[in-house]
């Protein structure tokens, strides 16, 4: 039999809804594309890690004698499993190695041979299959960043006098920013790196448009007139467009070098914009200039007035002057020579070493400016600069529009892969610098690539990224939804992004391009609102980092239902008419409605079907996963929906979770994509099941058995009470039985907020909306004792407590159960290592781990000397440093672990040597067995066939072409792991089998080698622990938390409240048939909050409970009122849930009908046990001597100035004096008070508070001579 999955009655009217993409694709795919490990080295694309290496290599020394070239990179398998890393507090990482080639180009070093070496570059954190990283034992997520895309942006601002100022900003991927902007005098300036401004014409001169003539010709503003005595007179009255210059060369002798240097001199004869008259004509003719430039007499002169104004402000006349002027502005110094000055511009914008627009920047630039520059040209070109200036002039003349920087075509996503690429770039650039330095130092020595490279350089950059970067975050692991949402989050904060303080309203607001890409609902409520958002359910990030969403193509009013949906970015969607997913259409996809409401950018016109270009693929396309899990979301106010989607992430996994009766149909996908559950990999039969393991025997064909080295049975280990980051627990249990048949993808386990393969964050409860004796005033909740008694909202929380054993100056610390001055009763549960036994009940103050630390030696007293003389041993030279249970800890010891480094003494070394020898022999035996099996299987496949010439990785022929395969010939092959994938025999089917067999052999061999390496390491080193730590003891304690007064609960519609009273079951209001309700909510919490979805859910839930059915009501396409009424009638439930209730205390009927039904409630992570706290005596602050604050410090309550005023107002002087002295920082007074209470004496007089002394010291620090006198 096959265990049947929950079938839900789906109310969706939209048909042909495509499957959701893998929800973790945004993390997993990005990381895969970055590392490209599954791609052959010669087929790797120019992206990710490969691209970063190619950008930084080859590296040469300063004389270009030695060259270090990059050939390839690869990684070794990780040393520890993911779980071992979490337990030991290590990073789950892989060793990265690069194959480098060092050769010499200098003929003098003929003896230097070319060296190819594999060099270790450090360990790199590696992504787990569920899209997380384990850093120092904690699971982390690298959040994708939404930042401004590289390219050119045109904007406007307003001067204080109201003038509009326009600007164009070029943002590169790497390099200096350049900005062009206008001022109130209509002059255009260029700013480089936001430093000093220079007229844009100076920049033109510097990039090769040297003369005024060249600049004016760019914009077609001038005509050139040949100077002749007769011809020039007809131009009297026209205006000069450029200066008339007299140019000559002067020779002078350089005093330093003695060389004769020629210098160009310019004399201005007539300035720009001079109107030619008779006198000017003579000057022009006398100056011997060949031609002059005049303004063109046409209409577009006015548009380009800004260029003429800028030329007037331009202090330079030639390219040389321009580059020198720019050098002076940027460097605040005189240029040493013209070459250096010219080099600064080339380096800034035209050198691919310093400047890079990136593929995205070039694409955006070409698109915006309508250019056709090749995509691989990723530096600025002259054409770019000219076109930007032209566009800016169009903008000034209202012939073009400014950019909307919040449009998603101007914002792109930097996924994990790209962020890592950037960090690797930084690390490799640092490494390249040190390599260059080492090459220069070791000029005449023989050296190898290993000598040049310091592995720490790269790993320190990567580790600091994971450890300190704002986007590398401690994963929210409260429940599977919290995990999946965290991995799909997009943040506008972080390095290179916005800051909370500077982000305005526009950036945070919902934009029309967010449709289907970013969720308009799910965002935090605090200062980060709108800056952190979530991907839509169907959204994908394309290769350039832009978010795409799918649509179905519409041609002449017919929707294409057959083809796969087309993914469009925000830019591609511009100007398209897009209809909703649930428009009326027939089976062939023809739109039947005469008019449809469509969406075009930010408008919603009603159009004919023939005008529609695309339709949405699904009604929930607009929302994120969390928002899509709220049934009847369309009936809720957006603010409450936001709270609902945020609170579902805080739901604590319960002992017995239950999937909602009223769901949205997305629950199964979330549970499976969270990667927590175990799924069957194929068709098979369950062989064995218990609480810890499930064994399945898979059906296999003969061919599959032939190419595999694994048995048909596969055993899956179930996770038992594993601690999550937030202290909730993952505990899986099987849902299949022995003998069951399974199909591919079938869920085999449940738990961790899932039931039967569906997300199950809470429980379905019978609810009544009515006031109950004032206990549910202001969102409070009244709940039945039955809910607590039946463990409906009971959850298990796991905490781990660890203690490190260090090597101190006075000697080693020690774990032991023999602790000085502690009773036998206190140590009865400790083992010989001082660790508490599994199953022991823990209460505050209990010893969890016993540890003693050597005490500092002081001169012994005569008594101590006598004791030592009698007993021999140093009595009491150790102190108790045990770990004790904190004040609020009640629980049961779930597990304990002890990690220790290997001890290095002579006996241990001998034992290690024997153990390593045995390991090697065992490996050798297994390896020979594996190779024998491979040869047997290979021979069965290729028996009687002829070799096609099999090569190894080095290109050598291992199995000669034309020879018939024999067993002896196959046994002779030494290394099957390094055979290249190729043609073994003539037919393809056999070749595929052989290649699959060798592929599986390599996997098996890798596993064997990895196990050998791990076991060797364990024997020689022991457990890997941070430096200075000899042992690490860990205790896991489970706490069972029942629902209590003060716990926070919520529904899925933003309806949250605190449990105010747990009422006896028999006192709860009951229905006509005598059934008491489980929970009573305040009806006044509904109308003002406008979240009517909870009422729809309540009524439909009651019908579902009575009928024993579950429903899927997708958002924006859910059950209508008529459908709900039909079901309530069928279930014999009153319409709208209106029914009379009876008082549980008196049995009398209440006067009014109330809404009754079944609602899905969650218990949130804000539990009263974590917040309740009381203190009598405890730790004090060192300087002020006042009690510390907060539960974590076992602190007190701050009695602030307002509280003091309150007591003053009551005239409670004695209470006030007590609070400000003995209860706070009167050190002597509080000790005396404690003594008086213990002895039962009268309270002493308070003394002087320590804070008064602090004030005195501060005043003395100001140089005031302060003395207290009686």
UniProtKB/Swiss-Prot annotation:
Which is one Pfam family of this protein?
RNA_pol_Rpb2_1
One GO cellular component, as annotated = DNA-directed RNA polymerase complex
**SUPFAM superfamilies for the chain:** beta and beta-prime subunits of DNA dependent RNA-polymerase
Q: Show the catalytic activity.
A: RNA(n) + a ribonucleoside 5'-triphosphate = RNA(n+1) + diphosphate
UniProt entry tagged with the keyword Nucleotidyltransferase: yes
Q: Which residues form a coiled coil?
A: none
Q: Which GO terms describe its biological process?
A: DNA-templated transcription
Q: Does the keyword Nucleotidyltransferase apply?
A: yes
Q: Which domain of life is it from?
A: Bacteria
Keywords attached to this Swiss-Prot or TrEMBL record, sorted alphabetically, are:
DNA-directed RNA polymerase, Nucleotidyltransferase, Transcription, Transferase
Q: What is its EC number?
A: 2.7.7.6
Provide a Gene Ontology MF annotation, just one.
ribonucleoside binding
Cysteines joined through disulfide linkages: none
Q: Which top EC class applies here?
A: transferase
UniProt family annotation = Belongs to the RNA polymerase beta chain family.
Q: Subunit details for this protein?
A: The RNAP catalytic core consists of 2 alpha, 1 beta, 1 beta' and 1 omega subunit. When a sigma factor is associated with the core the holoenzyme is formed, which can initiate transcription.
Q: What does the UniProt record say this protein does?
A: DNA-dependent RNA polymerase catalyzes the transcription of DNA into RNA using the four ribonucleoside triphosphates as substrates.
Protein's recorded name: DNA-directed RNA polymerase subunit beta
Q: Which organism is it from?
A: Flavobacterium johnsoniae (strain ATCC 17061 / DSM 2064 / JCM 8514 / BCRC 14874 / CCUG 350202 / NBRC 14942 / NCIMB 11054 / UW101)
The gene that this protein is the product of is: rpoB
């Amino acid at each position: 039999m096959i265990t049947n999955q929950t079938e839900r009655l789906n109310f969706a009217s939209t048909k042909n809804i495509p499957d959701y993409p893998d929800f973790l694709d945004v993390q997993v795919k990005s990381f895969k594309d970055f590392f490209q490990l599954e791609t052959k080295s010669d087929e790797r694309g120019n992206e990710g890690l490969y691209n970063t290496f190619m950008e930084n290599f080859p590296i040469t020394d300063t004389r270009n004698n030695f060259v270090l070239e990059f050939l390839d990179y690869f990684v070794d398998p990780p040393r520890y499993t993911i779980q071992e890393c979490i337990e030991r507090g290590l990073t789950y990482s892989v060793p990265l190695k690069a194959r480098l080639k060092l050769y010499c180009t200098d003929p003098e070093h003929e003896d230097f041979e070319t060296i190819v070496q594999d060099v270790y570059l450090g360990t790199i954190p590696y992504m787990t299959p569920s899209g997380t990283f384990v850093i120092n034992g904690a699971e982390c997520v690298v959040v994708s960043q939404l930042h401004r895309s590289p390219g050119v942006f045109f904007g406007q601002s307003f001067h204080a006098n109201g003038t509009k100022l326009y600007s164009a900003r070029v943002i590169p991927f790497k390099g200096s920013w350049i900005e062009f902007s206008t001022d109130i005098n209509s002059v255009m300036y260029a700013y480089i790196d936001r430093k000093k401004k220079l007229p844009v014409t100076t920049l033109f001169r510097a990039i090769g448009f040297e003369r005024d003539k060249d600049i004016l010709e760019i914009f077609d503003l001038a005509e050139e007139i040949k100077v002749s005595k007769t011809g020039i007179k007809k131009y009297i009255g026209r205006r000069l467009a450029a200066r008339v210059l007299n140019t000559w060369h002067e020779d002078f002798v350089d005093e330093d070098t003695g060389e004769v240097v020629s210098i160009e001199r310019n004399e201005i004869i007539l300035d720009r914009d001079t109107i030619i008259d008779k006198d000017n004509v003579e000057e022009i003719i006398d100056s011997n200039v060949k031609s002059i430039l005049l303004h063109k007499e046409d209409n577009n002169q006015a548009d380009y007035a800004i260029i003429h104004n800028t030329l007037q402000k331009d202090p330079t006349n030639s390219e040389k002057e321009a580059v020198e002027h720019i050098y002076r502005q940027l460097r605040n110094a005189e240029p040493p020579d013209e070459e250096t000055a010219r080099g600064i511009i080339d380096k800034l914008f035209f050198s691919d070493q310093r400047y890079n627009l990136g593929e995205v920047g070039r694409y955006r630039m070409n698109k915006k400016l309508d250019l056709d520059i090749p995509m691989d040209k990723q530096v600025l070109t002259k054409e770019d600069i000219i076109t930007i200036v032209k566009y800016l002039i169009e903008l000034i003349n209202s012939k073009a529009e400014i950019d909307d920087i919040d449009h998603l075509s101007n914002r792109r996503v930097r996924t994990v892969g790209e962020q890592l690429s950037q960090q690797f770039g930084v690390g490799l650039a640092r490494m390249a610098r040190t390599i260059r330095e080492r090459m220069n130092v070791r000029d005449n020595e023989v050296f190898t690539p290993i000598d040049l490279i310091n592995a720490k350089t790269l790993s320190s950059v990567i580790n600091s990224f994971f450890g300190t970067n704002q986007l590398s975050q401690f994963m929210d692991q409260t429940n599977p939804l919290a995990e999946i949402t965290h991995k799909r989050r997009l943040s506008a904060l972080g390095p290179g992004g916005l800051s909370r303080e500077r982000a305005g309203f526009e950036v945070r607001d919902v934009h029309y391009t967010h449709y289907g890409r970013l969720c308009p609902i799910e965002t935090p409520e605090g200062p980060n609102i709108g800056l952190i958002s979530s991907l839509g359910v169907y959204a994908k990030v394309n290769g350039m980092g832009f978010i795409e969403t799918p649509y179905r193509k519409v041609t002449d009013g017919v929707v294409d239902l057959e083809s796969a949906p087309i993914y469009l970015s925000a830019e591609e969607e511009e100007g398209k008419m897009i209809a909703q997913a649930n428009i009326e259409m027939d089976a062939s996809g023809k739109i039947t409605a005469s008019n449809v409401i469509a969406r075009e950018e930010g408008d919603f016109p009603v159009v004919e079907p023939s005008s529609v270009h695309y339709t949405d693929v699904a009604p929930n396309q607009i929302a994120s996963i969390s928002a899509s899990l709220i049934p009847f979301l369309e009936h809720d106010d957006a603010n409450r929906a936001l709270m609902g989607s945020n609170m579902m992430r805080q739901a604590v996994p319960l002992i017995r979770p239950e999937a909602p009766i009223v769901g949205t149909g997305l629950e199964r996908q979330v549970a499976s994509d969270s990667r927590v559950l175990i799924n069957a990999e194929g068709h098979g039969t369950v062989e064995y099941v218990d609480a810890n393991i499930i064994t399945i025997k898979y059906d296999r064909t003969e061919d599959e058995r032939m190419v595999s080295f694994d048995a048909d049975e596969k055993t899956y280990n179930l996770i038992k009470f594993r601690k999550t980051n937030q202290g909730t627990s993952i505990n899986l249990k099987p849902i299949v039985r022995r003998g069951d048949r399974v199909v591919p993808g079938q869920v085999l386990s449940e738990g961790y907020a899932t039931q039967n393969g569906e997300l199950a964050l809470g429980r379905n409860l019978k609810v009544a909306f009515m006031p109950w004796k004032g206990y549910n005033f202001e969102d409070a909740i009244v709940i039945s004792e039955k809910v607590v008694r039946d463990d409906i909202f009971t959850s298990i929380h796991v905490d781990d407590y660890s203690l490190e054993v260090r090597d101190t100056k006075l000697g080693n610390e020690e774990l032991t159960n023999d602790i000085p001055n502690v009773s036998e009763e206190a140590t009865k549960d400790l083992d010989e290592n001082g660790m508490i036994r599994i199953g022991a009940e823990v209460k505050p103050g209990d010893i969890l781990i016993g540890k003693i630390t050597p005490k500092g030696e002081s001169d012994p007293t005569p008594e101590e000397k006598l004791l030592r003389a009698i007993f021999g041993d140093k009595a009491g030279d150790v102190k108790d440093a045990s770990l004790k249970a904190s004040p609020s800890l009640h629980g049961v010891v779930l597990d304990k672990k002890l990690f220790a480094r290997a001890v290095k003494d002579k006996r241990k070394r001998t034992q290690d040597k024997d153990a390593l020898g045995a390991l090697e022999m065992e490996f050798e035996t297994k390896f020979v067995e594996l190779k024998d099996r491979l040869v047997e299987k290979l021979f069965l496949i290729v028996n009687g066939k002829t070799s096609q010439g099999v090569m190894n990785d080095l290109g050598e022929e291992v199995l000669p072409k034309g020879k018939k395969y024999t067993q002896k010939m196959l046994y002779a092959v030494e290394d099957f792991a390094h055979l290249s994938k190729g043609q073994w025999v003539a037919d393809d089917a056999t070749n595929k089998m052989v290649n699959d067999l060798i592929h599986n052999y390599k996997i098996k061999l890798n596993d064997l080698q990895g196990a050998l390496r791990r076991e060797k390491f364990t024997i020689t080193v022991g457990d890997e622990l941070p430096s200075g730590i000899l042992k690490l003891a860990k205790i896991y304690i489970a706490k069972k938390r029942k629902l209590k007064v003060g716990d926070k609960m919520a529904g899925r519609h933003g309806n949250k409240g605190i449990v105010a009273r747990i009422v006896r079951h028999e006192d709860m209001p009951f229905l006509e048939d005598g059934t008491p309700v489980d929970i009573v909510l305040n009806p006044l919490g509904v109308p003002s909050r406008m979240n009517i979805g909870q009422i729809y859910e309540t009524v439909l839930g009651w019908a579902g409970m009575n009928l024993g059915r579950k429903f899927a009501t997708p958002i924006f396409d859910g059950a209508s009122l008529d459908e709900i009424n039909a079901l309530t009638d069928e279930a014999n439930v009153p319409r709208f849930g209106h029914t009379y209730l009876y008082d549980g205390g008196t049995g009398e009927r209440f006067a009014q009908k109330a809404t009754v039904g079944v609602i899905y409630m969650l218990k949130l992570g804000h539990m009263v046990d974590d917040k309740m706290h009381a203190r009598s005596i405890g730790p004090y602050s060192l300087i002020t001597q006042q009690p510390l604050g907060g539960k974590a410090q076992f602190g007190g309550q701050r009695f602030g100035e307002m509280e003091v005023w309150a007591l003053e107002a009551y005239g409670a002087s004695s209470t006030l004096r007590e609070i400000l002295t003995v209860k706070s920082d009167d050190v002597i007074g509080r000790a005396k008070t404690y003594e008086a209470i213990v002895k039962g004496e009268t309270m002493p007089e308070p003394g002087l508070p320590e804070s008064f002394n602090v004030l005195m010291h501060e005043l003395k620090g100001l140089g005031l001579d302060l003395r207290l006198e009686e």
